[in-house]
Amino acid sequence: MSDVDAFLASMLPRLQTADTALHNGDASARVALWSHHDPVTLFGAVVATTGWEKIGATFDWLASRFSNCTAFAYEVLAAGVSGDLAYIVGVEHTTASIGDDPPADYVLRVTTIFRREEGEWRVVHRHGDPYDASSADVARRLDA
């Protein structure tokens, strides 16, 4: 198994679990995936911020807005590993409720960068933006 295959085999199930939980109102699995050692950055579809303290608070806020995740899938477009750094470029397909609304589909283009810390891969950067106009509408509702 190549380094990239081993990395993806380890991280994709954890990303799936963390993002499904976040979209069901629980940020704890996503918090556990992230490095708590600066520098860390988040360029989200709704919020952009830097520093673990602000990012952790952003995850709690996001979790408070989402519920009823009925589907989450991660489509990997590219991935790589070099020493203690790795990345995944992909498309996230999510169906979840925002507030009291019925579940809605949205799609994000996502780039995630990881750093190995004490033998564990931790997220240090995530950039996500809406894939299409309908996904942009969902992102706007999230920030309302």
Predicted regions and their residues:
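Extended, polar beta-sheet/loop recognition surfaces of beta-rich domains
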Residues: 141-144
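Short beta-strand edge/turn micro-motifs at domain boundaries
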Residues: 107-137
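A solvent-exposed, acidic/Ser-Thr-rich amphipathic alpha-helical stretch
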Residues: 8, 12-13, 27-81, 91, ...
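Generic short beta-strand segments
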Residues: 90-97
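Residue-level signal for tight coil/turn positions that link beta-strands
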Residues: 76, 83-85, 118
